């Protein structure tokens, strides 16, 4: 915690932050205001709530310190040449009432459906053979809360806050990571991020390779100016069995994740469609890939990058219990 000392204006919030971090990193089965207070020896959650809601400290500065602290040991532990991936994902937190900034009825993975809560976009740093860690986060705020001055005031939102999609929030997270010197071989994410043209353009402007999930209806430009959806492209170009190869995309909760994979070149020399097929059901998943000139573009490399996104999906919910707060 000594590295975080400069981000706090007073010693009291710094000491409370140290207690809070120890509780979050503990083996508490459920982490919320009351359980954290009991674990650190506080009589009530007031001190922690004051730290998170009202105390004066540099949030972005703290994120920068933590990001550098988290990335360095993973790089040191990784095998030479192993992939580094920035994995984008969002996670919900259930909330009661309407007083919390960003709260609305929406799809919540932690609730298994539609429920009242907030959504936060996360960026994780994944280093093959070494591990993964969260390095950035931004809360998504619904447009209707930003456009209503009364709601913005009552929930504590800045009156000059501009609406941002989850893809646009991801751009901010990645920009911060790039400024901090975080090097990524690929950026990976699900359909939320693959559908964001601004995010894809940002990554390409920075010569940053990506493997982003897209819907079956995503339109591709193939050779000779042919326009096909992902489904149509697979039906036309991947009929033959020899077009598919069986590869592992890494370990999962039930062992190795092995699928059939294929890829299709587009009219652009730096864009590809990567297709994953379930070996039993035949279900297809599509990834739009960008690999800048001068970087290796191979099927095994793209498959590995796509697979490195999966371990992150449960990180913030399971390990840090971020879906437990009410």
Can you say where each PLM-predicted feature lies in the sequence?
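An anionic, glycine-rich sequence signature occurring as long contiguous blocks
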Residues: 128-151, 155, 159, 211-314
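Conserved, well-structured functional cores that handle cations and Mg-NTP chemistry
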Residues: 1-188, 192-209, 216-219
């Amino acid at each position: 915690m000594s590295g975080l000392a400069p981000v706090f204006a007073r010693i009291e919030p710094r000491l409370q932050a140290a207690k809070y971090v120890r509780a979050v990193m503990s083996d508490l089965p459920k982490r919320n205001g009351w359980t954290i207070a009991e674990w650190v020896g506080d009589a009530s959650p007031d001190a922690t709530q004051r730290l998170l809601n009202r105390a004066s400290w540099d949030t972005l500065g703290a994120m920068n310190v933590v990001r550098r602290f988290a990335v360095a040991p993973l790089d040191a532990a990784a095998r030479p040449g192993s992939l580094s991936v920035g994995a984008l994902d969002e996670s919900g937190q259930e909330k009661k009432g309407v007083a919390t900034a960003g709260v609305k009825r929406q799809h919540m993975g932690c609730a298994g459906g539609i429920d009242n809560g907030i959504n936060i976009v996360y960026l994780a740093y994944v280093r093959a053979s070494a591990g993964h860690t969260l390095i950035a986060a931004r809360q998504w705020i619904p447009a209707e809360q930003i456009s209503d001055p009364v709601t913005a005031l009552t929930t504590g939102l800045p009156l000059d806050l501009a609406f941002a999609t989850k893809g646009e929030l991801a751009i901010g997270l990645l920009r911060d990571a790039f400024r901090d010197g975080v090097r990524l071989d690929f950026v990976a994410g699900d359909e939320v991020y693959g559908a964001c043209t601004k995010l894809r353009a940002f990554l390409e402007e920075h010569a940053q390779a990506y493997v982003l999930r897209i819907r079956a209806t995503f339109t591709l430009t193939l050779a000779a100016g042919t326009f096909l959806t992902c489904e149509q492209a697979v039906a036309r170009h991947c009929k033959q069995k020899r077009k598919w190869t069986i590869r592992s995309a890494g370990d999962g909760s039930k062992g190795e994740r092995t699928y059939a994979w294929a890829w299709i070149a587009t009219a652009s020399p730096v864009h590809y469609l990567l297709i994953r097929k379930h070996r039993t059901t035949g279900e297809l998943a599509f990834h739009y890939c960008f690999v800048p000139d001068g970087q290796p573009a191979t099927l095994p490399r793209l498959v590995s990058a796509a697979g490195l996104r999966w371990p992150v999906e449960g990180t913030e919910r399971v390990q840090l219990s971020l879906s437990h707060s009410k």
